[in-house]
């Protein structure tokens, strides 16, 4: 099937969308979504807890259905699509990778903070030994300069990563910021590895940024049907396909079939639409990790403080994935200020 696309699309509704659903996917939902995406021609479908293998925990939120069961179901359901899984070193383990492979996952996507690529070296080595295709995620890519990001990508590629993604975890990058980073990675990696892009809609630029990435040389692009992802969601796959069709980028995905899948199958599994509301906008504007949204809203309700103010301060402090517990400290800080009569602004 590889001759069918200029760009390979990975749908991450069943991984990034897990954040929006608080990791409560059922087997029936996963089976139906995989079948619909597969029938539409989606080549890669990512399935795991929102925070990757081993993410079901007190800190990140517990899964309704064990992720390994969902990976196994997805692999058994898909006729053509390959099943990818995400893992974060320090959250997931090498044994988790082996189990995901045994359950039918064939693409291992390993994510680190954009300055910490070195923690992925052993995991890429294992994944290649297991015969898995490898993808690297450099998260929160807006926080460092393109040349520094490229140096981190080189670490992943040398470790065995076959495609390194510029990951706009906060939805904070704007067009040229995406193009500059993708171009830097393309120049650094050459033929050693492909470059990908994973965007969020927190500033409404998921699709536009993905187009900028492709024009800068990206060969793999992420999206989620109906924007089903953290924060305001990911670039909607159905819109991506429509735009790529218009500009002559082949994806192998049928526009009408993916539009039907998004409307008729994915949307019913969503607890609500992923909204570009005030909280999401502040996340994009302030550079906040998108998966913080649900955690911030929960702590804001618990302590009676504005979620928007909590998110803005999280951005000011440059919190990254894994530091969700610090939202409690910020909420308590804001509450003390409010109780003292101080004005709290964004």
Curated annotation (Swiss-Prot):
Pfam families documented for this protein: DmpG_comm, HMGL-like
Give me the comment on cofactor binding: Requires a divalent metal cation. Activity is highest in the presence of Mn(2+), followed by Co(2+) and Ni(2+). Mg(2+) and Ca(2+) are poor metal cofactors. No activity with Cd(2+), Zn(2+) or Cu(2+).
* GO BP, sorted A to Z: catabolic process; L-leucine biosynthetic process
Per the record, where is site Transition state stabilizer?
15
Cofactor annotation: Mn(2+); Ni(2+); Co(2+)
Enzyme Commission no = 4.1.3.43, 4.1.3.39
> Any idea where the Pyruvate carboxyltransferase domain is?
7-259
Q: Which residues bind substrate?
A: 15-16, 169, 198, 289
Q: Where does Mn(2+) bind?
A: 16, 198, 200
Q: Which GO terms describe its cellular component?
A: peptidoglycan-based cell wall
Report the GO molecular function annotations.
2-isopropylmalate synthase activity; 4-hydroxy-2-oxovalerate aldolase activity; manganese ion binding
Catalytic machinery residues:
19 (proton acceptor)
Which reaction does this enzyme catalyse, per its entry?
(S)-4-hydroxy-2-oxohexanoate = propanal + pyruvate; (S)-4-hydroxy-2-oxopentanoate = acetaldehyde + pyruvate
Regulation of activity: Shows aldolase activity only when expressed and copurified with HsaG. This arrangement probably prevents the deleterious formation and release of toxic aldehydes in the absence of the partner dehydrogenase.
Q: Which UniProt keywords apply?
A: Aromatic hydrocarbons catabolism, Cobalt, Lyase, Manganese, Metal-binding, Nickel
Gene3D superfamilies reported in the protein's UniProt record: 1.10.8.60, Aldolase class I (3.20.20.70)
Matching CDD domains, A to Z?
DRE_TIM_HOA
Q: Which family does it belong to?
A: Belongs to the 4-hydroxy-2-oxovalerate aldolase family.
Quaternary organization: Homodimer. Forms a heterotetramer composed of two aldolase (HsaF) and two dehydrogenase (HsaG) subunits.
This chain's function reads: Involved in cholesterol degradation. Catalyzes the retro-aldol cleavage of 4-hydroxy-2-oxohexanoate (HOHA) to pyruvate and propanal. Can also catalyze the cleavage of 4-hydroxy-2-oxopentanoate (HOPA) to pyruvate and acetaldehyde. The aldehydes produced by this reaction are directly channeled to the dehydrogenase HsaG.
The record's listing under NCBIfam families reads: 4OH_2_O_val_ald, PRK08195.1
Q: What PANTHER family does the annotation carry?
A: 2-ISOPROPYLMALATE SYNTHASE 1, CHLOROPLASTIC-RELATED, HOMOCITRATE SYNTHASE-RELATED
This protein's name: 4-hydroxy-2-oxohexanoate aldolase
Source organism per entry reads: Mycobacterium tuberculosis (strain ATCC 25618 / H37Rv)
Q: Which gene encodes it?
A: hsaF
